[in-house]
Amino acid sequence: MSLSALETTLNTAFDARDSITAATKGEVRDAVELALDLLDKGEARVAEPQADGAWKINQWLKKAVLISFRLNDMAPIPGGPGGAQWWDKVPSKLENYSEQKFREAGFRAVPGAIVRRSAFIAKNVVLMPSFVNLGAYVDEATMIDTWSTVGSCAQIGKHVHISGGVGIGGVLEPLQAGPVIIEDNCFIGARSEVAEGVIVRKGAVLSMGVFIGASTRIIDRATGEVYIGEVPAYSVVVPGSMPGKPLPDGSPGPSLYCAVIVKRVDEKTRSKTSINELLRE
């Protein structure tokens, strides 16, 4: 089946999703299985980079993931500590992986790493005990550190470091919402959170504890320029606050959280400078 035919089939099936159950067979099930397999192998992805720097969102692949929840019944999933099982609709990506298949895949999965089927993990990725949700894409030579979460359909670029305890938000619904995108060569500091379709552009550095959602103000302190929903390339970002409105009695109001761009570096400087040096003021 061609990709255009697959897209048409899945769009039609999604419009009639209320009629789809675990008993559904035939074209719809085959189309969903094919789409999930393409996602799992990295041969298709929910968001694709374009030559002009924009990202194309393939909503039909998100629809395939959503339809799969209606097609699949709950079932035991083995692999829990002490022989325990989980109870879910989505099998593990790593279920039945042999030594040969791990060697061919070329990534490391430390005990405690959980990856759901339809997430793609590229070569030379290191997965510490972490969670990668369905439909996500993790590109080459990236580190997903301990207790980090890569949400559904999130896109993580090459040579990215997702530090310990980071949350990368997922998105399946609403359909029109775009996924979180972390472009190549980014560093996301420990316990930071990037959610609600935010794009972190190439080479950006987020310090520890930076929280960015769709409405978070990202302020360049050198220019006063305000960004929302996107961290500019090669920015170095730290947590900050901005003055709030005065209270009714005229006294100062509470400050509001924001993220602050403290400096920008070029690609050459970024590649030669340690993260600690970039963040040191």
From Swiss-Prot:
Coiled coil, from the record: none
Main localization, broad class: cytoplasm
Places the protein is found: Cytoplasm
Keywords: Acyltransferase, Amino-acid biosynthesis, Cytoplasm, Diaminopimelate biosynthesis, Lysine biosynthesis, Repeat, Transferase
Uppermost EC category: transferase
Alphabetized HAMAP family for the sequence: DapD
Protein name: 2,3,4,5-tetrahydropyridine-2,6-dicarboxylate N-succinyltransferase
Organism: Afipia carboxidovorans (strain ATCC 49405 / DSM 1227 / KCTC 32145 / OM5) (Oligotropha carboxidovorans)
